[in-house]
Amino acid sequence: MENAKMNSLIAQYPLVKDLVALKETTWFNPGTTSLAEGLPYVGLTEQDVQDAHARLSRFAPYLAKAFPETAATGGIIESELVAIPAMQKRLEKEYQQPISGQLLLKKDSHLPISGSIKARGGIYEVLAHAEKLALEAGLLTLDDDYSKLLSPEFKQFFSQYSIAVGSTGNLGLSIGIMSARIGFKVTVHMSADARAWKKAKLRSHGVTVVEYEQDYGVAVEEGRKAAQSDPNCFFIDDENSRTLFLGYSVAGQRLKAQFAQQGSIVDADNPLFVYLPCGVGGGPGGVAFGLKLAFGDHVHCFFAEPTHSPCMLLGVHTGLHDQISVQDIGIDNLTAADGLAVGRASGFVGRAMERLLDGFYTLSDQTMYDMLGWLAQEEGIRLEPSALAGMAGPQRVCASVSYQQMHGFSAEQLRNTTHLVWATGGGMVPEEEMNQYLAKGR
């Protein structure tokens, strides 16, 4: 971006200066509305989410047999919700900032099949596509036992079709593993940030991995192009897919059920704050949408991004969405948080969700490494760096009197708050790699 343009952008949005300087930044969204007001802009409804629930239930018998690790939950792919009181104390000590209420961790990092939040959206979109093809071919009805999809006849049928996706790693893992299991030919276009072990794991499942020297945006574009020339190839579009988004959104009702089971209350007197790591935006956007449908105005969602890849904060704050990239303002998009190394946000998610998100913040790679180490020490839970992005949220919210006043939170409401950090990945990181991460923490 030329200097004059840059100067006028900074004059209009002074916060951009802090982003350019790679400062850890917090922006509380002044444009937040009620759910009733913000919902129409999403373009999806409660019914769409219910349909996604129903589809996953139809596939449950299949998943329970195809992936024995899901058998115990009857083929439902869901993660644990755990309290992390020792980590809460450690954060308070390190940041000299009390965190009111209770701190919980949502362990999507340990979801079965692919060990990340992408096991929600990625697997769902592959299943939705498989169902559509099988229904259209007259091989399946909605009332069938879907475990029949494991038969050689179906494998043969699906092998005529292929799936392509562009990914920094975790989405590729979930889509690659699921597609290969169903019988699709699958190609994952991986950006330069993708970890070697993720590529190796995909290849071990018979997935074709195409590697790029460039970032996520290029991998997605190339994947899209490659798919266009083949009518039997379905491209899963991480930047714009409503189906992926709905796969993530199912998490809202599921979390509500987990809260009920644990006897936790979310209402006007007991607000819920959720901190979601954000790459291109589909995962956190879909989850936040589901949470809003489940808990209404009593849930407050925040997106967390690396200082080197603040694409969603930049897009929503300036209102330019996918018309601006972090590279345009001189940021390199290089971060250890490979799952979040995205330079240009999803225009669909930014525009759909900007009224339903309370804020956005950035944190440095070093902060992620530090918190990765603290969590391992205090709670014995090991995550990959990007999964710690949410962990910086509670102290930012608790430290901001202006945010608390903007929403009219009383001292009592803050005392009764639940802070939920969404851990997005790390359950399948090889030991050797994990030890390298742990060595970088302070």
Curated annotation (Swiss-Prot):
Cofactors (names): pyridoxal 5'-phosphate
Source organism, top-level taxon: Bacteria
Pfam families referenced in this protein's UniProt entry, alphabetically: PALP
GO MF entry, a single one: D-serine ammonia-lyase activity
Keywords: Lyase, Pyridoxal phosphate
Modified residues (N6-(pyridoxal phosphate)lysine): 118
GO biological process, one term: D-serine catabolic process
Coiled-coil region list: none
Subunit structure: Monomer.
Cross-referenced PANTHER family: D-SERINE DEHYDRATASE (PTHR48078:SF9), THREONINE DEHYDRATASE, MITOCHONDRIAL-RELATED (PTHR48078)
Stated name of the protein: D-serine dehydratase
Organism: Escherichia coli (strain 55989 / EAEC)
